[in-house]
Amino acid sequence: MPPRPRFDRRAPVRELPNINDRINYPKLRVVDADGTQLGVINREEALDVAKDRELDLVLVSEKADPPVCRIMDYGKFKFEQEKKAKEAKKKSHQTEVKEVKMRYKIDQHDYNVRIGQAVRFLKAGDKVKCTVIFRGREIQHTALAETLLRRMAKDLEEQAEIQQAPKREGRNMIMFLTPRKTPLIKTDKENQIPTRAVRTITAPPRATTAAKTQLNKDQ
C-alpha cells in the first residue's frame, strides 16, 4: 500500500471562489448581467438563469440577508480584478534611491553598464544617485568628474531629469536624477537633418545681334 501523502501545514490553502455550484445558500438576491434586479429567487432558479445566458452566478455579498449574487462572466471579472490590483500595487510603489558608482577614468564598457543600471532603476520609478569616487590625489580632478556626470545626465535625458546638479560630497562627487514625468520632446531644430547647400552658377549673358556684327567686322 503506497504511503499517504503528508499534509504540509506551511503550504497556503487556496480559497476557491464562491460561484455556481459552490454557492450553498437556498435563497439568493440576484442581479442580472445588465444590472437588472431579479429579486429574491431560489438557488436552482438562479443557476438556470446564469446557464441560459452562458454566464456564471457569482456570490458578491455573503453577509447580506439573503446573500447577493450577480450573473457575470467570471473569467473576465477575475482578469479585471487582477489588473486593478496590479495597477494599485504599481501606484503604491515606494520611491527608493538607487546608487550607481564609478571612477572618473571609467572605460566605455563599464560606462555603458552604469547607464543600463540607471535606466532600469528609472523605469522602476526610483531616483538614481550617480557617484564618482575619488582615491588619493584623484580629488584634484573634480572638473573631469563633473563632466562625466553631466555626460551621464545627457545620455539619460529621455528617462530622467536632474534633481540635484553635480556637487562635492566629501571625497566623492554626486548627482541625483529623478524619473521624467513627461516624455522628452526634442525641438524641430534638434530633429532636423542638415542639408548640403546648393551652389548656384549664373550663366553668362547671351551676345546681342549688334555685338555679333561688330565681332564679324573685327575678324
UniProtKB/Swiss-Prot annotation:
GO terms for biological process: ribosome disassembly. SUPFAM superfamilies: Translation initiation factor IF3, C-terminal domain (SSF55200), Translation initiation factor IF3, N-terminal domain (SSF54364). Pfam families: IF3_C (PF00707), IF3_N (PF05198). PROSITE patterns: IF3. It is found in: Cytoplasm. GO terms for molecular function: ribosome binding; translation initiation factor activity. The keyword Acyltransferase does not apply. InterPro entries: T_IF-3_C_sf, T_IF-3_N_sf, Translation_initiation_fac3_CS, Translation_initiation_fac_3, Translation_initiation_fac_3_C, Translation_initiation_fac_3_N. The keyword Protein biosynthesis applies. Gene3D superfamilies: Translation initiation factor 3 (IF-3), C-terminal domain, Translation initiation factor 3 (IF-3), N-terminal domain. Transmembrane segments: none annotated. Belongs to the IF-3 family. IF-3 binds to the 30S ribosomal subunit and shifts the equilibrium between 70S ribosomes and their 50S and 30S subunits in favor of the free subunits, thus enhancing the availability of 30S subunits on which protein synthesis initiation begins. This is Translation initiation factor IF-3. The gene is infC.
